[in-house]
Design a protein with these regions (language model features):
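N-terminal DNA-binding module of tyrosine recombinases/phage integrases
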Residues: 1-53
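N-terminal core-binding DNA-recognition domain of tyrosine recombinases/integrases
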Residues: 42-56, 66-142
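A short, charge-rich alpha-helical start-of-domain segment used by transcription regulators
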Residues: 58-62
Length: 142
């Protein structure tokens, strides 16, 4: 028999979260923070990929795509005076294959913007970063 005095309030967002729920919340908050550091149009891509990917994948892709935009601002004369919020899908379309080749070379060893730490990527790291970029381009240029 169900007690009619059972409090249904414990189904609200005030109850403690289990590990998986808390991890999802933390990753969602982290993704939102990373998205603030990317061009505004990029949010559309991440909304579209949400149903087909984990929060962790989206965070990693966001970091990888941010590295790409920073690479363009630091190494491509066309984007030297850009701020990250100025980029548009048209800028991506204007890039040449050599720009992507130079990016791939750059990814082997580069300094992280936040702390200047030297980052190196082996084959797996390069493959993931290029996968993020391919997926990103695929969304905008189907």
């Amino acid at each position: 028999m169900i007690d009619s005095s059972t409090n249904l309030a414990n189904t609200s967002s005030n109850k403690p979260h289990n590990y998986h729920e808390q991890s999802q919340i933390d990753q969602t908050v982290r993704l939102r923070e990373v998205l603030k550091t990317l061009p505004p149009f990029v949010k559309d891509y991440f909304r579209a990929m949400e149903p087909k990917s984990s929060a962790r994948t989206r965070i990693n892709y966001a970091y990888d795509i941010r590295v790409f935009f920073h690479f363009l601002m630091e190494n491509n004369p066309v984007y030297k005076n850009y701020t990250i919020d100025r980029f548009t899908p048209q800028d991506l379309e204007n890039l040449e294959p050599v720009d992507i080749e130079e990016y791939l070379e750059y990814l082997k060893v580069y300094k992280r913007d936040e702390d200047g730490e030297l980052i190196t990527n082996g084959e797996k790291g390069l493959a993931r970063k290029m996968s993020a970029l391919r997926s990103f381009y695929g969304y905008y240029f189907k």
